[in-house]
Amino acid sequence: MADDLARPVFRVPDAPLKDRLPHVRPRYALPALRQHLEMFPVVMLQGPRGAGKTTLAQQVAKSKIDFSNRTDVELFEINPKGLLENAAKPVLIDEWQINPSSLWHIKHLVDEGLGGFIVAGSAGHYEPDSAHSRFPLVGRCSILRVPVLSWAEQNALLPQPLAEGLLAGDMSWAQPQELDHTGYLAIAMSTG
């Protein structure tokens, strides 16, 4: 256990995203996550299980505390404030619902002026408003909903900005596709 205390919290290597996470598809939510992190000390990712909340967060996180990892749980139990304070920011707190008290520790650090927390897990929807006054991050976090992959995301067809594409002569986005009813049904089924 003493050796575990010397273990650094998971750090993301300083390599390009395509090298670190080659399987990751571009997501519409990525620019929104970056923007929310600039504006709020905490961003809570919400969405169905398997929607890609953790994968999305790992694209911007510099460190990670994963409550599905027993070592991270033990380290958190020993020194929650130190672990959260010293983690490189932004830090992903993954599977927070396993340890809901972690939100109270984050609240106290935010109240001390610290930010850069991404909270993800599969725990239903918690709204940071006055109707949920027991929610510790009321007024301190932003909720970013992460839907399942869209058809465009599944096929890596995220468009470039329209004006940029038009100036470059790229009209590929305007090419019609012939789909019958089973094709449309297949798209609908694959995107939730």
Language model feature labels by segment:
Residues 1-192:
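Phosphate-binding site recognition
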